[in-house]
């Protein structure tokens, strides 16, 4: 069953709907230590936004960077290496467990663990202040059993239809 859930979350099954809250909860429970390691490390840094790529962070810009023209030299100035071995190991472990992206913006830390073919993603999010996570195109969000942690679905098309007019 665990292998099936991991395959679903990693997108290996060709699944075109997001995982259920129960599936995300199981993923969270299996990866909680690594999630907390990364969360605790990022809490020590003083940046408004961060997008983690492998062993480096892009700071000052969020994952929407691909939609905004930024010169390579400007981007290089914003790349910071992660030198903490425990954090690097946690990031590698999360990637192996199906985590697609890790980013922080608007007081919300997001771990995207599933991405659909049409502007849908799903994962876990953390917000220390007890507020609901601030995630673009949020359509579902429920608290997990651990304070500050939530599972979410962000679906642009569903969000657009709900907010039309």
Q: In which residue ranges do the predicted regions lie?
A:
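Bacterial N-terminal signal peptides
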Residues: 1-8
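N-terminal export/targeting and maturation segments
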Residues: 12-88
């Amino acid at each position: 069953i665990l292998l099936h859930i991991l395959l679903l979350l990693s997108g290996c099954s060709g699944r075109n709907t997001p995982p259920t809250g129960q599936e995300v909860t199981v993923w969270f429970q299996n990866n909680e230590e690594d999630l907390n390691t990364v969360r605790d490390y990022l809490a020590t840094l003083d940046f408004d936004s961060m997008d983690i790529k492998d062993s480096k962070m892009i700071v000052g810009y969020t994952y929407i960077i691909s939609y905004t023209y930024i010169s390579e030299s400007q981007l290089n100035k914003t790349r910071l290496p992660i030198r903490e071995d425990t954090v690097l190991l946690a990031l590698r472990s999360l990637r192996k467990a199906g985590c697609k992206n890790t980013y922080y913006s608007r007081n919300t830390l997001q771990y995207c663990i599933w991405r659909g073919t049409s502007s849908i993603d799903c994962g876990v999010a953390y917000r220390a202040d007890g507020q609901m996570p601030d995630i673009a195109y949020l359509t579902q969000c429920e608290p997990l059993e651990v304070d500050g942690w939530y599972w979410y679905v962000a679906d642009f098309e569903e969000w657009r239809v709900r907010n039309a007019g």
